[in-house]
Amino acid sequence: MEDLLNEVVPQEDLERFEKKYHHELELDGEVTTDTKFEYAFCLVRSRYTNDVRKGIMILEELARTHPDGRRDYIYYLAFGNARIKEYTSGLKYCRAFLDIESNDQVRSLEEYIKKEIDKEVAKGMVVAGGAALVLGGILGLGIAMARNKQKREK
């Protein structure tokens, strides 16, 4: 799954679908659902976080307004959120997808996200533990210095 998440869209594909998207927007003032999806699909696979976020926004709008393609939109919402390490959102979309249907690829993505969440929690605990040790050390040093000062004054 990690390989799939790290795979990026070729720049020429992204540019082609971006051009198509903007062409439709300029021509008709609207963009077809298919073009929006194609563009969002490329964006969530971009190497740039801002592109991925833009793709997520388009997919969220599609999921709200076009229930026919909801399954695909939800999958790529989970995928895009996982790519930018928004694991809570990614997990939410995985579960929403699995409510619609069972799918091994989505289950694999869900497991990957859960492992990443566990890693984040572990990192947080290490940082908190380290901070507590540093604080304890500083406090201990302060107490020792205060005692030493009291002994000298006697």
From Swiss-Prot:
Signal peptide stretch: none
InterPro entries: Fis1, Fis1_cytosol, Fis1_TPR_C, Fis1_TPR_N, TPR-like_helical_dom_sf
Subcellular location, record wording: Mitochondrion outer membrane
Primary residence: mitochondrion
Residue ranges of coiled coil: none
Entry's transmembrane regions: 125-145
Gene Ontology terms for molecular function: lipid binding; molecular adaptor activity
Pfam families: Fis1_TPR_C, Fis1_TPR_N
Alphabetically ordered keywords of this record: Membrane, Mitochondrion, Mitochondrion outer membrane, Transmembrane, Transmembrane helix
Chain ranges on the Cytoplasmic side, renumbered to this chain: 1-124
Topological relation to the membrane, as annotated: Single-pass membrane protein
SUPFAM superfamilies associated with the record: TPR-like
Domain of life: Eukaryota
Ranges of the Mitochondrial intermembrane topological domain: 146-154
An example Gene Ontology biological process: peroxisome fission
GO cellular component, one term: peroxisomal membrane
Changes seen on gene knockout: RNAi-mediated knockdown results in elongated mitochondria.
Free-text comment on this protein's domains from its UniProt entry: The C-terminus is required for mitochondrial localization, while the N-terminus is necessary for mitochondrial fission.
Family (UniProt): Belongs to the FIS1 family.
PANTHER family: MITOCHONDRIAL FISSION 1 PROTEIN (PTHR13247:SF0), TETRATRICOPEPTIDE REPEAT PROTEIN 11 TPR REPEAT PROTEIN 11 (PTHR13247)
Job of this protein: Involved in the fragmentation of the mitochondrial network and its perinuclear clustering. Functions downstream of Pink1 and upstream of Drp1 to regulate mitochondrial fission.
Protein's name in the database: Mitochondrial fission 1 protein
Lineage: Eukaryota, Metazoa, Ecdysozoa, Arthropoda, Hexapoda
